């Protein structure tokens, strides 16, 4: 834990909202840093440090960082659903109404996202009809948390359906790993023209996906056991994936 604290503290000391060290490549290129998925991942980690240590410096950094990007009317300097995950906890901890407004704004973006025929969200507008493992991490936990907190779980079935599609169509039965992406239209140059799948399993994407499963399991409200089967589906998929990855770990 001491090593983690030292690493995080040094990272934060050298970072500002305008120039976070985790986006150093953009800084070196002279590009402006905007609200992005890396910010979401890193600020979630900072908030985890606050939850564990109760050291106010972590909360202050996270709040200052996100506050800089979110305007009083809830509009945001940039578009990214993943970074929106930080807003729930910061709203709880600070009570800032602009965070609540920003949560609704991000959700409104989810409502109009284009979808594949399967019902899954496109990964991005520039990747039509494509489902990527990365996108399951970037979008589904936010979607699930909003439904849990503010929408009476009305779209739980939609969320579980998107996970089910990935589990049934993107898992490699030969090794238990998942292919990085699938083009449901079979048009992308990289996809198998029969299955629509990419040729490779990518460790980083599998990491995103495993966290999508785990984060969703932590968020889901199944107190009335209405979604027992769906929760078990996610649990089984997570355990199966971890057991499959262990076979490939370095000794």
State the predicted function of each range.
Residues 1-251:
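Glycan-recognition and catalytic cores of secretory/periplasmic carbohydrate-active enzymes
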């Amino acid at each position: 834990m001491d090593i983690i604290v030292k690493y995080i503290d040094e990272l934060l000391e050298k970072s500002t909202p305008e120039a976070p060290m985790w986006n150093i490549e953009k800084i070196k290129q002279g590009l402006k840093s905007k609200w992005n998925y890396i910010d979401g991942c890193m600020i979630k980690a900072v908030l985890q440090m606050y939850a564990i240590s109760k050291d106010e410096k972590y909360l202050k950094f996270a709040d200052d960082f996100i506050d800089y990007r979110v305007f009083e009317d809830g509009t945001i300097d940039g578009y990214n659903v993943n970074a929106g995950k930080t807003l729930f906890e910061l709203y709880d901890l600070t009570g800032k109404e602009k965070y609540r407004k920003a949560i609704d704004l991000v959700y409104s973006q989810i409502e109009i996202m284009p979808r594949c025929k399967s019902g899954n969200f496109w990964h991005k507008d520039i990747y039509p009809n494509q489902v990527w493992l990365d996108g399951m991490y970037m979008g589904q936990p936010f979607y699930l948390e909003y439904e849990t907190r503010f929408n009476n779980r009305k779209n739980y079935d939609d969320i579980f359906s998107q996970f089910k599609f990935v589990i049934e169509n993107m898992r490699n039965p030969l090794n238990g790993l998942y292919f990085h992406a699938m083009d449901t239209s079979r048009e992308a140059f990289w996809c198998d023209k029969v299955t629509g799948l990419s040729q490779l399993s990518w460790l980083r994407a599998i990491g995103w996906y495993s966290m999508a499963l785990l984060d969703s399991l932590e968020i889901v409200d199944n107190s009335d056991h209405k979604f027992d089967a769906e929760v078990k589906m996610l649990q089984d998929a997570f355990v199966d994936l971890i057991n499959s990855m262990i076979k490939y770990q370095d000794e």
